[in-house]
Amino acid sequence: MEHVLEEFAGGKMHVDLLAVEGATYRADPPSAMRVSGKPLTEWIRAIADSADYTVAVGTCASFGGIMACGRNPMGTTGLQYYREEKGGLLGTDYRGRAGLPVVNVPGCPAHPDWIVGTLWALRANRVTEADLDRFNRPRAFYGKLAHHACPRNEYYEFKASATVYSQQGCLFENLGCKGTLCESDCNERLWLARTGSCTRGGFPCLSCTSPVFPDRFVPFFETAKISGIPTSLPLDVPKAWYVGISGLSKLACPERLRRNAVSFKPAWSGKKEPPDDGH
């Protein structure tokens, strides 16, 4: 193994693509993982210098993720970003031999399509810097919001919100959903053999593809507010518009949505909701 790594690191063997999963260190602590006597970060730097492309797989490798949260006493970081700050292990100016910076494929976890699709497109030389967003994520996968195609969108549009989990309404206003902040195509692409997503399962989106996940999105299961207004507002609507539109939307909310939002079973117009017997 050491011989092969030396060949890659020294440029004696061609490296089409280096994919790294998991956070790395800015400076190696004594407990840092070593391979053949050298810190793993040293191998990553050397092989990245020889690689045509370098890919960070998952939020930890991309931005530091969970391993870099809080005070980050271990000094963990992503390959080319530390949260929103460019730099990371490989530095701001790093580029692979094909000319691209580190291509970030965040997610906790990253969707298999995002990983395989990115690797294939890079290997086929079909990715340019214009295809990457401001955090070097492929726009094809991260150019939308998880909110898009969420089955609860009708409730969201009229601000008909659930107050407890398992109710039918939107989870954004009260229950911590960050789908309007999460840049990903989760609700269009779907997970679990194309059957579901976090919000389709009644669970709030945590915006795990974001460079500031998880710290910036706590509390996870309730919505932080100031004077009744969520502190984190949707990315696709100007903040002043959102505040104004929200009030009008609630006033215009159909009774059907208002009722179903706090119901555990949809009650269709003209039909009475069955009594809640606790089952």
Each model region followed by its residue ranges:
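Iron-sulfur (Fe-S) cluster-binding modules
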Residues: 1-19, 92, 96-104, 117-279
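Extended, subdomain-level signal for the structured scaffold at the beginning of enzyme domains
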Residues: 1-44
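Short, conserved loop/helix-junction motifs that constitute active-site signature segments
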Residues: 45-51
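Early transmembrane alpha-helices of polytopic membrane proteins
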Residues: 110-112
